[in-house]
Structures are given as C-alpha cells and as structure tokens.
C-alpha cells in the first residue's frame, strides 16, 4: 500500500467503504469469536459447565473496564491522528501515536496491580455467588496478568486501521482469535485446567497479537511509525485525545456498570440461572454489536479524512452509506434471533433448563434491536468528526439516564415475573435512546457540515 492516504478523499464512497469496512467487520466478527469462544468451551465442560459459564459472566464487567481504558486512549487518539493526516500533518499524527502508546503502558500497570489485589472482592460485589466465585476468581487471577497485552493490542490496532490498513488490523484480531480457538481446548480439556486454562489461552493469544501490532508500527509499511522520541506525555497532545475518547470510554465502562446492575438484579430475582442466561445474552449482543462497530470503524477514516479535508459532500455521503448498511445488518440479525433463538443458546450450553430460560429472555431483551443501527452510525460519526460533546451526550443518556434506572424500575412495574422484567429494561431504553440520538444528530451534524466550504 502506498504511503499516502489521498485515496480516502478520491475513491468512490461505495467502493471505499466496502474496502475498509469489510475487513473491519470481519475483524470484529473474529474478535467476537475471540471473546465468546471461552464461554462456548466453558459452557460445555462436563462438570459444572453452567456454573462456570455464570462465573465467567461475572468476570465480564471487569474485562469491559480493561477494554474501556484501551478505548479511552485509542478511540480518541486514532480519529485525531486521521484528522491530522487529512490536514497533511503526519508528524503531528505520530506524536499522537507515541503519546497514546506510553499512556496505555501506564494504565496497564495500574490496572494489573488493582486487579491482583481486589479481584475477589470485586467479583463478589458484581454478582458472584458462593457457587460461582471459585470459577470467576480462577479466571480473573490469570487474566489480570495479561492486561498490558489487551491494552496495547486494542489500543494500537486502532491506529493501524485509522491509516487505512484495515486488512492488517483484521490480521491482528485473526492471529489472536485463531490462537485462542486452538489453545482453549488444549488448556481447558487437554490439560484439565478448566476456567484457568481458558484465561491462560486468552493471555497467550493477546500477547501474540500485541507483538504483531508493535512489529507493524515499527516496520517499513506503516505511514505513522512508533518512535521513541514521541513516547513522552504532552498535555497538549494527549488531553484532546482523551476528550474525544471519553465517549467511547463512557460507553464501554458504562457497559460494565450495566452488566453489574443486571447481574446483581438477576441474582436477586432469578438466581444463578438468570445470571447465566445474561452471560449468553451478552455474548449474542456482542455478536450483534461488534460487526456494527466494524462498519463504523471502516467508515470512520473516510469521514475523518474528508472532514479534515473540508469535503462536505463526501462526509454526508459516507454517513448515509454507513447508516443504510447498519440498518440492513441490524434488521436481518434481529429477524434471525426472533425466529431461531434455539440456534444461539445451543452454542453455549447443553443444559435444557438454562437454554429454555435464555430463549424466553432473548425475545424480550432483543425486542427493538433492529433500530440500533441508527444509534451506532450516529455515535461513530460524531466521533469521526471530533464532536466529543455530542458523543458523550448520546452515551450518557442511553446508559445512565435510561438503562440503569430501568433495570431497577422494571421489576416494580411488572411484578408478575421480576426476573424477566429485568430483561425488558434493554429494549425500553434503546427505543427512547435511538429517538434522542436521531434528533440530536440531525441538528449537530447539520451544524458541523455547514462550517465546511461548499456545504
């Protein structure tokens, strides 16, 4: 690939989005497998598989926080780097890359120390029961040691994709996912390590992906190179990145808070089986959301570059294409989930009781998922044009203003089956949030475009 990204401003939008989004979508699907393959294997353990699956689900809020810190840096830094490249300032983009790299190392050290000290206390607070805490702590003790690999893989890979090297970004995830899929059964079943084996397989796989990313960013093919002289924190460089990445951090860390709220409420009203069902539902939700994010990540360099180049027509066109694609995908997947829920639950558990409970919850939890393409397309475009305040507003309203209170209100509104009522909080919040997002986006996007020449 040529060491320039002018094609982002010249190639036909349909062809360009296809070229960038397809590898990103594939990467996100692979990333989904990376994240849920542990659950699939663990759920089929011959002894205690359902409880082990529930224990792993209790770990997810902590894992989400680790990923959220990677997003704080990368989802702000990568678009800022793209905008700088659109202005022709590759040196400034490399300073952003170096600042983000060193900050992620610092964050990794802090997170690892905290998890090794307080993981059991956190897991008990996050919904672990006496029957599941052993499985949860066994997984988290090992996972914590690989925090630095998670941070650097997720964080630095965003800078590879932001340069237009979407296939290389896809390979990052592919390498880790294939490694994890191969190592999981070896450690879980072959070496009889159970959940600890799943965690060890994940850490080793992330380490391999991390090495791949760092070798690329230090190699000859990259446009932006990771340089030692840029690896020092500069407030003027890193603070704008953190401001823009705050929306992604809020979205992902709020997922952790939401997950804790779901787990504790479901444990109260439905016991371990309800928490186990939520583990399966969150896995299916990941299946739904990650490809949507892949579409957004494919469109993001196009929108950011052309916004930096002040090409209003291409910015509008890229958003419309992203919106249509997101709606088609979300609608098709919603239909499949509604018609064939058993196809999804069978992947995670052979336990008939857990499968039946999950299928009943699934139709409630995903009732309005077909609308969520609007939410993701608008959110990703806000980030791509550097509209940090709007991105934060959308994230805060959906998670904190709507979903979090509804998790606790719905059982009171529908007391007949309080456990199932908890799952209804998700579609109720999504319906209101999508409406709010669409209205806000129509106003703010118009203002942003009107500032560009020939708008």
Positions of the model-derived regions?
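Short alpha-helical transmembrane segments in multi-pass integral membrane proteins
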Residues: 1-24, 81-148, 190-245, 303-368, ...
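N-terminal transmembrane alpha-helices
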Residues: 8-48, 61-80, 105-112, 147, ...
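Transmembrane helical elements of multi-pass membrane transporters/channels
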Residues: 19-38, 142, 176, 205-209, ...
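Helix-terminus/linker motif at the lipid-water interface of multi-pass membrane proteins
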Residues: 29, 33-54, 123-130, 186-193, ...
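Alpha-helical transmembrane segments of multipass membrane proteins
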Residues: 36-40, 113, 121, 155-159, ...
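Small-residue hotspots at the loop-to-helix junctions and early N-terminal turns
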Residues: 50-61, 137-140, 199, 272-287, ...
């Amino acid at each position: 690939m040529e060491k320039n990204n002018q094609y982002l401003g010249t190639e036909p939008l349909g062809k360009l989005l296809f070229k960038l989004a397809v590898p990103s979508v594939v990467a996100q699907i692979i990333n989904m497998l990376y994240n849920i393959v542990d659950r699939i294997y663990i759920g089929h353990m011959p002894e205690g598989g359902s409880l082990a699956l529930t224990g792993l689900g209790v770990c997810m809020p902590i894992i989400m926080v680790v990923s959220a810190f990677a997003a704080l840096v990368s989802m702000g830094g990568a678009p800022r780097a793209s905008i700088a490249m659109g202005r022709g300032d590759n040196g400034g983009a490399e300073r952003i890359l170096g600042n983000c790299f060193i900050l992620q190392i610092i964050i990794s050290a802090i997170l690892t120390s905290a998890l090794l000290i307080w993981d059991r206390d956190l897991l008990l607070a996050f919904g672990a029961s006496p029957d599941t805490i052993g499985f949860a702590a066994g997984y988290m003790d090992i996972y914590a040691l690989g925090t630095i690999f998670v941070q650097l893989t997720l964080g630095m890979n965003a800078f590879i994709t932001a340069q237009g090297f979407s296939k290389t970004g896809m390979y990052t995830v592919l390498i880790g996912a294939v490694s994890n899929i191969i190592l999981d059964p070896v450690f879980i079943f072959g070496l009889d390590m159970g959940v600890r084996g799943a965690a060890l397989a994940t850490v080793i796989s992330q380490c391999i992906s991390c090495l791949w990313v760092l070798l690329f960013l230090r190699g000859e093919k990259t446009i932006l190179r990771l340089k030692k002289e840029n690896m020092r924190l500069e407030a003027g460089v890193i603070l704008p990145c953190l401001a823009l990445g705050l929306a992604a951090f809020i979205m992902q860390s709020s997922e952790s808070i939401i997950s804790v709220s779901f787990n504790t409420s479901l444990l109260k009203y439905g016991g371990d089986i309800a928490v186990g069902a939520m583990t399966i539902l969150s896995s299916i939700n990941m299946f739904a959301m990650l490809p949507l994010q892949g579409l957004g990540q494919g469109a993001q360099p196009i929108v950011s570059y052309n916004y930096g180049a002040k090409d209003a027509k291409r910015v509008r066109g890229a958003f419309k294409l992203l919106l249509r694609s997101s709606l088609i995908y979300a609608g098709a997947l919603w239909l499949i989930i509604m018609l064939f829920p058993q196809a999804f639950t069978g992947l995670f558990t052979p336990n008939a009781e857990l499968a039946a409970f999950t299928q009943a919850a699934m139709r409630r939890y995903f009732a309005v998922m077909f609308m969520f393409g609007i939410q993701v397309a608008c959110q990703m475009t806000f980030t791509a044009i550097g509209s940090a305040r709007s991105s934060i507003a959308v994230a805060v309203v959906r998670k904190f203003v709507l979903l979090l209170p509804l998790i606790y209100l719905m059982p009171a509104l529908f007391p007949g089956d309080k456990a199932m009522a908890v799952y209804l909080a998700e579609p109720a919040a999504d319906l209101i949030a999508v409406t709010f997002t669409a209205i806000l986006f129509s106003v703010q996007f118009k203002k942003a475009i009107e500032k560009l020449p020939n708008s």
